Regions:
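Secreted/periplasmic carbohydrate-active enzymes, especially glycoside hydrolases
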Residues: 1-98, 102-103, 108, 112-113, ...
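Substrate-binding/catalytic cleft of secreted carbohydrate-active enzymes
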Residues: 81-84, 93-247
Length: 247
């Protein structure tokens, strides 16, 4: 069912601040307490806009790994600490990598104004198995539907580094299905079918560059935005472009 709420005052959910509304639903003796946030997130041209304002995504890659809990945080304080450490280092969010994170972690992201991209673990996926695609699509659907209302999630990225997909048709079909499924479940957020390397459908063409030499890294990418402007936004098919750049 649909409920329309009249708000006595309105404020937007903001990075680094949060800004949540408390929601209390009651029906007879039953009561449910929750929360929500109001914000917009989209790409426009070469810019990412949050609440209509250009925002540079300065993110860490967070795998949610803990020495004492492996892929489960030992305590809730550990979840909060990860966010606080990232903020303290000058970042404003994280790409949640190769894992569907705890809903409690996403709550603290919402509360603190920590931006994240949602992802799913695709490492070791056996595409030749007849149940592989069905299982993956079902579980990814559950993840998107569970986390749809978190204002901290500003985009979806179901796959990571799809090596060897260009030569295998069934893998390409899965990427296409994933993108279309994600946009059908949530048309409000941008989606990258696969971050890094090969892709089929995507609103963002991102790159992974692991060069640890700052000079060669700068030489490779310096002036990229100027080259794009000179060609009117047209670049060679094999050359990626950044999804955002600081102004």
């Amino acid at each position: 069912f649909t409920v329309q709420l009249d708000l006595s005052e309105t404020h937007l959910w903001e990075p680094g601040k949060g800004g949540l509304y408390t929601l209390l639903l009651s029906f007879g003796e039953d009561r449910v307490k929750s929360y929500f946030g109001l914000r917009t997130a989209k790409f426009q041209g070469r810019k990412f806009l949050l609440n209509g304002k250009s925002l540079f995504q300065r993110f860490v890659l967070d795998q949610g790994f803990y020495p004492d809990g492996i892929y489960t945080a030992p305590t809730e304080e550990d979840l909060v600490k990860d966010i606080q450490l990232s903020f303290a280092a000058g970042f404003n969010g994280a790409r949640l990598h190769e894992k569907v994170f705890e809903a409690r972690f996403l709550y603290h992201c919402d509360r603190l104004g920590y931006l994240v991209w949602g992802e799913y673990p695709n490492w070791g996926l056996d595409h030749a198995h007849p149940l592989s695609t069905e299982t993956y699509l079902n579980q990814w659907s559950e993840a998107v539907e569970r986390d749809f209302n978190h204002p901290a999630i500003i985009g979806w990225c179901p796959f990571n580094e799809t090596w060897g997909y260009r030569e295998e048709r069934e893998k390409n079909a899965l990427l296409t299905s994933l993108y279309k499924l994600t946009k059908r479940l949530d048309p409000t957020r941008p989606c990258i079918d696969s971050s890094g390397n090969y892709r089929i459908l995507s609103e963002v063409y991102d790159i992974h560059d692991y060069d640890q030499d700052t000079q060669s890294f700068q030489a490779r990418w310096d002036g990229l935005t100027d080259r794009i402007r000179e060609t009117g936004g047209v670049i060679p098919a094999e050359d990626p472009f950044f999804n955002s750049a600081p102004e």
